[in-house]
A protein has these predicted regions:
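Long, low-complexity, Lys/Arg-enriched
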Residues: 1-85, 96-131
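Short N-terminal targeting/anchoring amphipathic segment
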Residues: 87-92
Length: 131
């Protein structure tokens, strides 16, 4: 696994890439909205994801459920392969969504998975040199 971290006070300070697929949460905070808007124009296919604990499923694009055991098949039907470039917008996604997606992407041998997270502006790191 290769982990590369970038820091900036705004999205414009970060390296720009193009992705084939993005997975976003259904967030309503300004940080969520800003992070999702930052992906516009950089992604070919964007899907919103919300974990439904009572059904043990992901609600996709606020339209249909995909059971957690069927997520790999769903991703393959989207066209995701081991060579796909994928970004998870982790500001708006919850832990359950991230975990289910990461497990399915790992099982599909996807190597090009990035994560975007916008921390609240008032966060102050005590040790900025330690990750």
């Amino acid at each position: 696994m290769n982990i590369i971290m970038e820091y900036g006070s705004c999205y414009d300070e970060l390296e720009k890439e193009k992705w084939d697929f993005a997975f976003i949460g259904i967030g309503s905070e300004q940080r969520d909205i800003t992070a999702i808007e930052a992906l516009n124009g950089s992604v070919s296919n964007i899907s919103s994801i919300l974990y439904q604990p009572n059904d043990c499923a992901l609600l996709v694009n606020e339209k249909f459920d995909v059971g957690v055991d069927d997520v790999e098949a769903y991703l393959e039907n989207l066209g995701i392969s081991e060579n796909s470039k994928i970004i998870l917008e982790c500001t708006s996604l919850g832990f359950a969504e991230i975990l289910v997606l990461m497990q399915a992407l790992k099982n599909l041998n996807c190597k090009g998975v990035d994560a975007l997270y916008l921390a609240p502006g008032h966060y102050a790191r005590q040790h900025p040199d330690i990750y």
